[in-house]
């Protein structure tokens, strides 16, 4: 029995099909067609209503299929007509749009866009679908080639009965909490595995554990890479993209990826080849238009969130990893950008890589892009298998959505124990009724705890054993390939000296904006001018003038002892996340980083003090002679480097800005009071503090430089040869830095 269509809709669809047929047929019969005054074909049907135009992507796909194009004036005319004529395929009231199949049934060769397509190509072509997109530049809309894979070690990852526990220390006792319980699964090269679950379900913990970034002392079960345990060699084969985009805000996109390439790519590649790899990754990720834009941060404008995420991914795929792990790569992105990010991961997987990603709440389009799925709930495994079979599995145990909903939302509701819009399995309902508990009073449905217990038990009894048996199958690799996974030797991308040079240059570029900010320059120069005005051409021929000038020298010692300390304490705490990330990836040796970090500040640190002394020295009437001027500047430089060392040590020991600032304030205040200007006679039992004060030694050296020809003792301070003070400052310079380095060595890598 056939159903009758509404007469209006039927007639409308037939009329428009006939109009389209007549338009195209007339256009084919006449190379130039019948044109109106504006150059538009007279037979073209007018755009009616709110119909949709042929999409840009659809047009590109059609043009890509054309076997050839006309040339000459005819081509120009047809292209002009094509630009002016937008064929609108209006959806009729029945909701059915004119499909490509119906166009193919016309049996015609399309020419209104300036190219010919035989009927057989039309009939063989696929329907228009936005799901066929490949990663493209979001702004420019240009297709990008797939990730150009190079030969790499394939990694077959298996994990069986994985557990993870942490000890929570309280005031009087400690409690052991289980984060993961009996997680099993596998993922092979060419596959994308998604880890799904509500917040706090253990997704990030499992991801870090699979990446080898969690100490094995607190884990249980087995994790194998090509049937071999984790080794340090694998660090150079694993890419790990953190949830937060840990990037330097003042570096451009190109600089960020270039430095990553120079540090991480093997020594066999030249500097130019590494630079070219960075440019290739920029092109692969569609970042050409923003490659010279700063990354940006909380206080610096930069690239967009989607571009920043792609830079983070580029930092990892630049090494051509065998295993790529990503923590929430779509977090904070719009649906289109998120889809393109997942499609990019598919391209990487298709090149023979193993890809694992956590995902919080994907759209339905994203969900169907994953090959495998792990669903976690309260640290337990609720499902592992093909993502396309997840709904069938839960339907088989009696859990089906009662309303139309996103599959991912359905699974997350189950993982949370929320079954308000989900059918209640009869077995679960009977169990709750028999126990007279585990039921919510308001809805009358089983409680989240009862739902969770049922789902865990259902998976363990129906699926778990079968999946565990599959893990026993050997991986399809020869023994030589397997043996590569067990090498214990690390593979540094470059030698120690090159690591130092690269990190030194990176540090200069990143912090050049901080040192020459208008606020800092204004602060230093305004202080210098005020000092110059207060001590304008002071006269040391009188005792009062000599004492006043000694006060100026003490202020210089205090100012350039105080200023560097509170700048340096921020160094390591602010870069802790970056240091954790790069050390976990074995990008460089800690010693190379530490030396580069502490020396890259020095060239910039000497510019402002030099300007300060040039203003103060000549305005206040200090000894006008090259010898005392340069000795005074050298003394201030020694004070700055020693004070920096103290700030670095405090910051590295505490790694907390609030605590470090408090401790630095107390320490600097103590050193200032013990500096020999305020208190002339210090009690013996506490007099040793002055010898730890860089203010004290700097003050004595400045007095010697200025007044060694005038007096033996000034303001209660005896002037000697100054070697003791120089030696004390040098010991502080190296001693404080050694303490800071040892503190960093003891710092655990937090993932």
Curated annotation (Swiss-Prot):
Residues involved in ATP binding: 197-204
GO MF term (any one): ATP hydrolysis activity
Keywords: ATP-binding, Membrane, Nucleotide-binding, Transmembrane, Transmembrane helix, Transport
Principal place of residence: membrane
Gene3D superfamilies (alphabetical): P-loop containing nucleotide triphosphate hydrolases (3.40.50.300)
GO biological process: response to water deprivation; transpiration
Disulfide pairings: none
UniProt region (Disordered), positions on chain: 26-81
Membrane-traversing stretches: 516-536, 552-572, 602-622, 634-654, 666-686, 722-742
GO CC list: membrane
InterPro entries xref list: AAA+_ATPase (IPR003593), ABC2_TM (IPR013525), ABC_transporter-like_ATP-bd (IPR003439), ABC_transporter-like_CS (IPR017871), ABCG_dom (IPR043926), ABCG_transporters (IPR050352), P-loop_NTPase (IPR027417)
Ranges for domain ABC transmembrane type-2: 498-707
Keyword Transit peptide among record annotations: no
UniProt domain ABC transporter: residue ranges: 157-403
Localisation: Membrane
Membrane-topology annotation of the record: Multi-pass membrane protein
Family: Belongs to the ABC transporter superfamily. ABCG family. Eye pigment precursor importer (TC 3.A.1.204) subfamily.
Name listed for the protein in its UniProt record: ABC transporter G family member 22
Natural source organism: Arabidopsis thaliana
Gene: ABCG22
């Amino acid at each position: 029995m056939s159903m009758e269509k509404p007469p209006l809709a039927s007639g409308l669809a037939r009329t428009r099909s006939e109009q389209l047929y007549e338009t195209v047929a007339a256009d084919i019969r006449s190379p130039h067609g019948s044109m109106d005054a504006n150059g538009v074909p007279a037979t073209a049907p007018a755009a009616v209503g709110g119909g949709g135009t042929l999409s840009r992507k659809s047009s590109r796909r059609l043009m890509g299929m054309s076997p050839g194009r006309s040339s000459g004036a005819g081509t120009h005319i047809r292209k002009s007509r094509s630009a002016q004529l937008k064929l609108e395929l209006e959806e009729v009231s029945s909701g059915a749009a004119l499909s490509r199949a119906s166009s193919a049934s016309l049996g015609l060769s399309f020419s209104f866009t300036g190219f010919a397509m035989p009927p057989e190509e039309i009939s063989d072509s696929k329907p228009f679908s936005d799901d066929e997109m490949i990663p493209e530049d979001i702004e420019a809309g240009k297709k990008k080639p797939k990730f150009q894979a190079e030969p790499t070690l394939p990694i077959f990852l298996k994990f069986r009965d994985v557990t993870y526990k942490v000890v929570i220390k309280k005031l009087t006792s400690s409690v052991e909490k289980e984060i993961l319980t009996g997680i099993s699964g596998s993922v092979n090269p060419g596959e994308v595995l998604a880890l799904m679950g509500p917040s706090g379900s253990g997704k990030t913990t499992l991801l870090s554990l699979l990446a080898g970034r969690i100490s094995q002392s607190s884990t249980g079960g087995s994790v194998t890479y090509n049937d071999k345990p984790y080794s340090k060699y694998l660090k150079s084969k694993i890419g790990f993209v953190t949830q937060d985009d840990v990037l330097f805000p003042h570096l451009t996109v190109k600089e960020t990826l270039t430095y990553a390439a120079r540090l991480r790519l093997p020594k066999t590649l030249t500097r130019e080849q590494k630079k070219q790899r960075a440019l290739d990754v920029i092109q692969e990720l569609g970042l050409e238009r923003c490659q010279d834009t700063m990354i940006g941060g909380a206080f610096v404008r930069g690239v967009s969130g989607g571009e920043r995420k792609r830079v983070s991914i580029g930092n990892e795929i630049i090494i051509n990893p065998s295993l790529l792990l990503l923590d929430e790569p779509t977090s904070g992105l719009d649906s289109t950008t998120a889809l393109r990010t997942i499609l990019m991961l598919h391209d990487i997987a298709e090149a023979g890589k193993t890809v694992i990603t956590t995902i919080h709440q994907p759209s339905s389009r994203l969900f169907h892009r994953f090959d495998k799925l792990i669903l976690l709930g309260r640290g337990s495994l609720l499902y592992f298998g093909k993502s396309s079979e997840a709904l069938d599995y839960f339907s088989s145990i009696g859990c089906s959505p009662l309303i139309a909903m996103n599959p991912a939302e359905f699974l997350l509701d189950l993982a949370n124990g929320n079954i308000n819009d989900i059918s209640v399995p009869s077995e679960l309902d009977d169990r709750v009724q028999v126990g007279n508990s585990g039921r919510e009073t308001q809805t009358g449905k089983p409680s989240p705890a009862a739902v969770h217990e049922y789902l865990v038990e259902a998976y363990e009894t129906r699926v778990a054993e079968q999946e565990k048996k599959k893990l026993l199958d050997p991986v399809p690799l020869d023994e030589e390939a397997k043996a590569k996974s067990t090498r214990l030797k690390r593979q540094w991308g470059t030698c120690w000296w090159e690591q130092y040079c690269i990190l030194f240059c990176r540090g200069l570029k990143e912090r050049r904006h901080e040192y020459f900010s208008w606020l800092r320059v204004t602060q230093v120069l305004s202080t210098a001018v005020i000092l110059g005005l207060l001590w304008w051409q002071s006269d040391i021929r009188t005792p009062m003038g000599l004492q006043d000038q000694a006060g100026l020298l003490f202020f210089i010692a205090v100012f350039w002892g105080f200023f560097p300390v509170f700048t340096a304490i921020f160094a390591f705490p602010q870069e802790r996340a970056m240091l954790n990330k790069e050390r976990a990836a074995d990008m460089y040796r800690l010693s190379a980083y530490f030396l580069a970090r502490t020396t890259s500040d020095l060239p910039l640190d000497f510019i402002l003090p030099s300007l300060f002394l040039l203003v103060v020295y000549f305005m206040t009437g200090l000894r006008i002679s090259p010898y005392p001027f340069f000795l005074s500047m050298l003394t201030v430089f020694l004070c700055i480097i020693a004070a920096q060392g103290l700030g670095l040590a405090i910051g590295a020991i505490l790694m907390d800005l609030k605590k470090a600032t408090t401790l630095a304030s107390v320490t600097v205040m103590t050193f200032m009071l013990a500096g020999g200007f305020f208190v002339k006679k210090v009690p013996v039992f506490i007099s040793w503090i002055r010898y730890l004060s860089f203010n004290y030694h700097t003050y004595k050296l400045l007095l010697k430089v200025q007044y060694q020809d005038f007096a033996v003792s000034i303001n209660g301070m005896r002037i000697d040869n100054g070697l003791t003070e120089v030696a004390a400052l040098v010991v502080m310079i190296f001693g404080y830095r050694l303490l800071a380095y040892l503190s960093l060595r003891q710092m655990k890598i937090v993932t």
